[in-house]
Amino acid sequence: MRENPYLVRMDVEDDCNFTTYNEKSGIYYRQFNWPVTGVMKDEFDCMQFDNAEAKPVGYHEHSFGTETFMVSQGKFLCYCMGSGFYLEPGDLLHIQPWMGHSFTPIEPNSRLNIMFMGINQFKGITEVRRRLTADFPGVFEDPEFQKVFVLKNGNAGHRTFPAENIVEPEKVSQLRKDGVGIREHDYGCIKLLLKIAKYETMGEKEVWDLYMKPGFYCDWDNFVQEYRLFWVMSGKVHCTVKTSATETLEFDAVADNTIVIPPFTPFRFEVVEEAHVRDLDCTARLQDLCEELDAWKAENPNAKMDREEMFGKFREFEFNATDIGCKCCDK
């Protein structure tokens, strides 16, 4: 049972919802976050492969839902839609329906962090497989059972492994290399890199990499129906969560910590040490907002947007922050 409901230290078993180690496959599995809302988004887990000889994830595809694969340690040889490439720390691979994909660890203790939407991976697939394998030997492996099971869970089945075909990373549109965004916006104390756009999540959310300098802060001092999920990749962020009208919980989040904020929960974060944070569930139209802000700046290169006008833009594009700034710049 985790001590802090808003913080998951990904290396601490007590902070995980579930952990298991399979000696046969050499995979250490950790479940960090259950799916939320009717679209079942934000399920987040990790597969750690003990050695390069551990059983790889075979080539397969899904008929619905999305999977986002992110490496936090080690290296993988991946195939997506027939093209092979390497997935390294900081990289992101976003898989949509009918995209064949596979993963083979090539370094010991390689970690593959996976975020799901619309699939119900653990409770609908992993837990069912564990229970049937333990209590009803042979049932899960039965071909007739598999025909029904994989269809119900959006698994369109395993595919023949592609012919060897290693390509340059830029030729794989589903791959987002570390430090590179689909679109990029630099505002001095914070640089935003769009990693996954709304058109890739059926309009549900965007995923952003935030590169922030010490003193940058953002405040959501309101009660909005939003789930928020942040993964600290490096640096340190200080968080303040209002737990009642008179009480707050404060804590620091560092590398390989996730910050989990449920709906109707006022919170704030402030950067303590230069940080790289991945916003895994941005429901705002943040790309649209940045385009608007950039257009205004181009027309007014020597001016600073009025605060009331800026927050009006925020609300127009569903970015619900109540305060934002940088202590270095605010002086």
What do the predicted segments below correspond to?
Residues 35-45, 53-68, 197-206, 214-231, ...:
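A short beta-loop-beta micro-motif enriched in histidine and acidic residues
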Residues 49, 102-165, 272-331:
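Double-stranded beta-helix
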Residues 72-73, 89, 233-234, 273:
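A cytosolic small-molecule/anion-sensing beta-strand core signal
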Residues 1-43, 58, 133-206, 219, ...:
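A short, N-terminal "cap"/entry segment at the start of jelly-roll beta-barrel domains
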Residues 57-59, 78-79, 95, 100-107, ...:
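Short beta-strand His + acidic residue motifs that chelate non-heme Fe in jelly-roll/DSBH
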